[in-house]
Amino acid sequence: DYLNIMSENGVTLDHFDELKATNEIAFENYTSLPPLQAALSLTSRIFELEPVHLIESEYVTENFDAELILNVLSQMTPESVRIYHVGPDEEINRQLQFADGGYRVEEIKESDFINWEKSEYALAIPVAELIEDDESASVEMLAGYKTPQKVYSADGVQAYLSHTQNFSGKESTLQIGLISELPITNLENYIASGLFTVMFIQKNRRFYQRAYKRGIALDPSPDDQGNMIFRFYGRSSKQIQYAKQLIQKYSDFTADERTFKNAAKILLDYYEGFDEQDISDQLDWYTDNAIKRPPNIYSKNQILNALQKFKLEDVEAFKEKMNQSIFLDIYGHGLFSPEEFRLFASDSRKILGGTSTIDPWHLDDNFNVKTGTSRMKKVSIPRDGIGIVDISIYPEKSLEIFSQFRILNKLLAPTFFNSLRTDQQVGYVVSSYESRIREYPAISMVIISDNTDLQSLKEKIINFQYGFAIALEKISEKTIEGTKKAILDEMNQKPENIYVESGGYVYDWQQGNYLFDTQEEVKKYIASSTKMDLVDLNNSMTFDGKLMNINIQLKVKSLNNSDFFSWAAMSD
């Protein structure tokens, strides 16, 4: 039916002009990908197009040819349709050769076509939109906005603004946080917040699409505490206008039973199918859960049990309380006018109404690292393979130590990969990375493998750590200085785009560090670190046990004869 409607009413110059304007904006706003991603993206089409047209081919919309379009539509008949469905409970009659699973193929019956024609859905062609040339007057880069500055502050709202130092300002990024302590207070609020987020996203899809056609990507998603963050990326000229409209939609939002049921099903399906996700994703989730790092502080069973009891009125009651406690936290980067930004912050606070949260709120972290202790989480999963993540957490909240961990991992990571992946072939994923866990510096080592011996994997990690400590003492000062220079050169290079340029500031804004100095402080600590600093730090952990160990182990349930790692089973 819809194909017929398209043929009769959808092939119009107005719809073509909408597509053409959308593609022109997308081409003008083209952002280059990192080198490897760009290479993979371009080579996928290299046999179909001339190399000179590989990028622009997706955006070229030159001539409207109704006859050509109708000719293509005429070939799209119901009889030629192919339907693909993926699900855990489908009947199969053919096994896959190189993977676990199977499939079936069946003909679509004539009765199916007849039933589909009886559909009660009302189909219609969307009205063509006029995508106007909305370039606003340019704003000059202001000297005082190289780093974020507070441009507005009042009860229940604050706004920070910085100006790009490397780009024209045609593109910007805008972050709007609707912040309250309520979502993370208890399990019921956490569930209500998640349901509301999904409901709001589902209900406003057309709005996101309308913004996207005008060169603005919009990502409404929760932060680690379950609070809604509206993130805008793309053309600067209309971002504030769309942001105001979205805040108004949030303020006015009411849900119906159907939207609630859809949201509940999405979350139920996610958690019920969680064990089938990639092992790397499960390792991340169980790591957070082991140390109670938001948002993953509740077990899957707790979440599923709570979800099954929830009703629409529970979400409505939560939203009413939430609306009365929102602190509006705003950060923008690009070339927004400070005056326009102040007015936007003030108007947005008025849209949301009064609040009991006058000052910025950030979660108080009561996590403690206890030297010489270990936490283990052992999980049996249905999918094949095993995974282990072994984390060494330093027992002091120190940005200096974290900076030194960055140097250590720059030396450690390739050696760890070469030793356990290339030489010993213990897994198909072998990696390490530095991070901050609840503000404590940490180094994590990850192995994902078909090897079923978790005891052996953990012992290999321990042996590697001892070997690396000995090798570190023999590394030359020249190698250390070269490693530091490589890290600093990477940090100081011109960012690929405005979103990378603002990334460090966005991180500080989310953490409540309104000095916005984390990146610069890390650079200073890296530059001043010596070989002796690194050796002493590494030895204090490896030989003196100045750390807390977090160990997460996953293995397929069918491997009954394969043991999890335990300290008691350590070989001499």
Please name every model-derived segment.
Residues D1-F27, E188-N189, F207, P222-F274, ...:
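M16/insulysin-pitrilysin zinc metalloprotease superfamily fold
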Residues D14-N166, L283-K370, M376-P382, P395, ...:
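C-terminal regions of mature proteins
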Residues N93-R94, T185-L187, Q239-Q241, P338-R342, ...:
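Short, conserved charged micro-motifs
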Residues L178, F232-S236, G332-G334, S392-Y394, ...:
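Short beta-strand-to-loop capping motifs
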Residues I201-N227:
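Catalytic or ion-translocation cores adjacent to nucleophile or general acid/base/metal-coordination motifs
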Residues D1, G169-R210, I247, L267-Y270, ...:
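Active/ligand-binding-proximal structured segments within catalytic/core domains
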Residues T164-K170, A217-P220, K377-I388, R421-A442, ...:
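A glycine-rich, aromatic-flanked flexible loop/lid motif
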Residues P78, G169-T173, K213-G215, Q225-N227, ...:
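Extracytoplasmic
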